[in-house]
From Swiss-Prot:
The lineage of its organism: Bacteria, Pseudomonadati, Campylobacterota, Epsilonproteobacteria, Campylobacterales. It is a multi-pass membrane protein. Na(+) binds at residues 75, 78. This is Fluoride-specific ion channel FluC. It catalyses: fluoride(in) = fluoride(out). It comes from Sulfurovum sp. (strain NBC37-1). The chain crosses the membrane at residues 3-23, 37-57, 68-88, 101-121. It is found in: Cell inner membrane. Na(+) is not transported, but it plays an essential structural role and its presence is essential for fluoride channel function.
């Protein structure tokens, strides 16, 4: 492993983690619900961006750029572990409706957002 790739992932992760903290906190504060919309929002946003950039990085490939943005920043922005913890916490509280909604929305919306990001890239750049 080349040291500059590790530095790129770490730098991207630093930025992505800060963005996740700010965006998810802001969205959650705006929401009048106990449902984890902050986590959902960063997962959907990150999925849209990764869909768009996946096609970009197919043609403009510098390993450190992909490591910085895809692995580092978007890996830290999106958060499967927090989604899992919030889901388990709802399970333990017997909130079955919220559990099903959380799982369904995260999976469905993230897949759709990735597809929309790819579609936008194709529309803009052919």
């Amino acid at each position: 492993m080349q040291p500059y790739l590790l530095l790129a992932v770490g730098t991207g992760g630093f930025v992505g983690a800060i963005l996740r903290f700010l965006i998810s906190g802001w969205v959650q504060r705006l929401s009048p619900t106990l449902f984890p919309v902050g986590t959902l929002s960063v997962n959907v946003l990150g999925s849209f961006i990764i869909g768009f950039l996946a096609l970009y990085f197919e043609s403009v490939v510098a390993p450190h750029q992909k490591a910085l943005v895809i692995t580092g920043m978007l890996g830290a922005l999106t958060t499967f572990s927090t989604f899992s913890l919030e889901t388990v916490t709802m399970l333990q509280g017997g909130l079955w409706g919220r559990v099903v909604t959380n799982i369904t929305l995260n999976v469905f919306l993230c897949v759709v957002a990735t597809m929309l990001g790819m579609m936008l890239f194709k529309r803009l750049y052919g």
